Amino acid sequence: MSSSRFDSNKQLTTSSLVIGYALCSSLLAVINKLAITYFNYPGLLTALQYLTCTVAVYLLGKSGLINHDPFTWDTAKKFLPAAIVFYLAIFTNTNLLRHANVDTFIVFRSLTPLLVAIADTVFRSQPLPSRLTFLSLVVILAGAVGYVATDSSFTLTAYSWALAYLVTITTEMVYIKHMVSNIKLNIWGLVLYNNLLSLMIAPVFWFLTGEFTEVFAALSENRGNLFEPYAFSSVAASCVFGFLISYFGFAARNAISATAFTVTGVVNKFLTVVINVLIWDKHATPVGLVCLLFTICGGVGYQQSVKLDKPIEKVSEKDSEKGEEDEELTQLVPGKLASVV
């Protein structure tokens, strides 16, 4: 009886974590688009997100609800290059959402396997992709090309940011894995270092982009009031959901299998598209949406083909656990914290 009740409670907890992760992941890109639409200061917006995550991790750590590595300058110096790459990925992502719709963001986010496959073959001397993997990459590329060709809101500025985002997020995916392997930090330690260092980097970009002059001009024009009601609510939601996806992402990854986590991530993309279409008119044309779905489906095929391509080897239990931990950190840290889907 008690065993049955325990299993029931565990299942309920797991379901709650998965639902929480799905809601945060599917809503975050749309919420960020709302935030940047009503609060057109990408540098300040991301700084508020970093501040929220940093303070939340610190307070939860002080209360004993989570455990994170202490902040030390020696570790910070080692982690700084990864934090810069992380900041650039979030910076380009926010500016992409500033100039383009959510669908364009998802298309370019889905193109990352193509760049990773090319980089692995050219720079790391990895073998050419299998037929199934190659076919999946072709589907991704075809969907992306079709989307761009039918995008009625195409602008050079938006697609310049899209290309910059594609390069930085691909670099981050590779580089964060390298940093995780060489700097021993737990999950919440990574969250703390990523966001605190990014918060320190933010003022540099405020001055380089000239955004600080826009903020001061808006403050003087609005008598010190920078937030309108819509802006305040969307920015607050963006900050809260940015932190929640860190928590639910890590917790859900621990509670379910890697395959189930991947499937959940794919479903989240479809939910994002549906939500974006339902709430307003800032989305792609019907033909563009079909091309977007092709790109997402190609990404699903790529993920499955890569799993099939992996050789089955006998490894020790210790090595297996370490590999799973590194894979978990690699999947969850890049592109998830504070701002992106």
UniProtKB/Swiss-Prot annotation:
Q: Where does the record place it?
A: Golgi apparatus membrane
Keyword Transport tagged: yes
Show the GO cellular component annotation of the record. Golgi apparatus; Golgi membrane; Golgi trans cisterna
One GO biological-process annotation of the entry reads:
nucleotide-sugar transmembrane transport
Cited InterPro entries: Sugar_P_trans_dom, TPT_transporter
Transmembrane segment boundaries: 17-37, 41-61, 71-91, 103-123, 132-152, 156-176, 187-207, 231-251, 260-280, 283-303
Q: Report where it is expressed, by tissue.
A: Ubiquitous.
Question: Which Pfam families does the UniProt entry name for this protein?
Answer: TPT
Region ranges (Disordered) = 316-341
One MF annotation (Gene Ontology) recorded for this entry: GDP-fucose transmembrane transporter activity
Domain of life per record: Eukaryota
Functional description taken from the UniProt entry: Acts as the major nucleotide-sugar transporter for the import of GDP-Fucose into the Golgi lumen. Transports GDP-Fucose in a strict counter-exchange mode. Is required for proper plant growth and development. Also acts as a GDP-mannose transporter that may be involved in the import of GDP-mannose from the cytoplasm into the Golgi lumen.
What more does the entry say? RNAi plants display dwarfed phenotype with severe developmental growth defects. Cell wall composition of the RNAi plants shows a considerable reduction of the fucose content. GFT1 down-regulation also has an impact on the levels of protein fucosylation.
Q: What is this protein called?
A: GDP-fucose transporter 1
Organism of this sequence: Arabidopsis thaliana (Mouse-ear cress)
Instruction: Please spell out the taxonomic lineage of the organism that makes this protein.
Output: Eukaryota, Viridiplantae, Streptophyta, Embryophyta, Tracheophyta
Q: Gene encoding this polypeptide?
A: GFT1
